[in-house]
Amino acid sequence: MPKMKTSRAAAKRFKVTGTGKLKRNKAYKRHILTKKTTKTKRNLRKATMTDETNVKNMKKILPYM
């Protein structure tokens, strides 16, 4: 059986934690920031875990992570 290919786009966007969960950065922090509150922008800085409903698909496109 041939090797599975890792999705390079996904590999650059996700990291695996020590417990095996997928960590990701939040969206909506690139532009049009003037209308967003300071609190919103501060909360967007923090990384978060990938939702459990998406983990199965993410593991499929990231076979070696």
Curated annotation (Swiss-Prot):
One of its GO terms (biological process) is translation. GO terms for molecular function: structural constituent of ribosome. The gene is rpmI. One of its GO terms (cellular component) is cytosolic large ribosomal subunit. InterPro entries: Ribosomal_bL35, Ribosomal_bL35-like, Ribosomal_bL35_CS, Ribosomal_bL35_sf. Belongs to the bacterial ribosomal protein bL35 family. It comes from the Bacteria. Keywords: Ribonucleoprotein, Ribosomal protein. This is Large ribosomal subunit protein bL35. PANTHER family: 54S RIBOSOMAL PROTEIN BL35M, LARGE RIBOSOMAL SUBUNIT PROTEIN BL35M.
